[in-house]
Amino acid sequence: MINLRAVRVIYRYEMLRAWETLLQSFASPVISTALYFVVFGSAIGSRIEHIEGVPYGLFIVPGLMMLALLTQSIANASFGIYFPRFTGQIYEVLSAPISPTEILLGYVGAAATKSIIIGFIILLTANFFVPLQIQHPFWMLAFLILTCVSFSLFGFIIGLWADNFEQLQLIPILIITPLVFLGGTFYSIDMLPPTWQAVTLFNPVVYLVSGFRWSFFEVSDVSIGISLSVVLLFLFTCIAIVWWMFRTGYRLKQ
């Protein structure tokens, strides 16, 4: 049986830490996204009127949200578990009568919650720039939650793997950010030459952005079923990796 009190203590601690750094945790990603709207939505949008029948300013909204969700989910979760390792507080958590599942629910739940809040703030902010309408609110919410949970798990893995703050930033900067920008955030992959279209399909972020965009406009580069399958596959893969890390004590007992 899950010790909900233990989960709540970890969850509350992580959420309070976010409120103490409110400007960095919530305002910063929203301001960055707003600047993307100004630069890409206004400047480039005046030259590219429509993509697949959707005004360019509207077209980039799901991609910009996904950009913020991915980066913030990873950052929140990776720092959330790495900092206790760095300070040695993780040993207090591991020695307490708390199961790995409860530790995971506390840290990942808090990281995902912070990202979901950011997602909704960005959604509200987007309405100041474009007349936003969501065709499938249920699927939008489903992709939002699945993405935040999946990449919070991925961030948790990075936080356990990293030996220093440089490694903590290595994967997000060198891998995640390029994948997001090359994943159809600001364009449709149909605009690419056939060869690059085929290469782009190996980018998992394409399926996240495509499925999320479909929930807004019923426009996508790949089918909704494939997008959902990729998200679920990534989710269960991360769960399996975290389970292995706890089972073997990888970077937890060092």
Regions picked out by a protein language model, each given a short descriptive name:
Residues M1-P137, A142-Q254:
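Hydrophobic transmembrane alpha-helices and immediately adjacent juxtamembrane helices
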